[in-house]
């Protein structure tokens, strides 16, 4: 990627991305490198329940700050938000504060909720029974077999999300973010040129 001047982006939850920090910086100097990271839960204890076997949110925040200091742009995916679990103002504000401090370029969020396909739903409910006894019944009663499972607080949370991001210069329009990810204007031997990656 670096040798031929291509841009690079990856979605990760792992601090291991920092093993290649110098290479990522080199790619970003020649073309463009953007690291995307998923943040779901501000509270690390809850994160360990919802996202076992991956780095907790505070560790990912450290990665985002390291990338910031290295001059590498970042984008955060705010998903999934689970109704009755992490769909709180406190959780959202905590994640947004991390993003503000890390100076992320954009946050992708398609709403405060999640999607459940047939097959996934059964697995999800099984995990709910284990970690949050009794909550499965609330989901079944409220959402039935819906594919889109939105928080009852979606409107309020999305208003906070957009307001806080606007105040801090963080892009929230997915189309704008995806366009940013797929184009770069640093082409070896050319000035002020723009190349579409895809």
Which role does the model predict for each range below?
Residues 1-142, 146:
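Conserved AdoMet/S-adenosylmethionine-binding subsite of the radical SAM
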Residues 125-198:
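C-terminal accessory extensions appended to soluble enzyme cores
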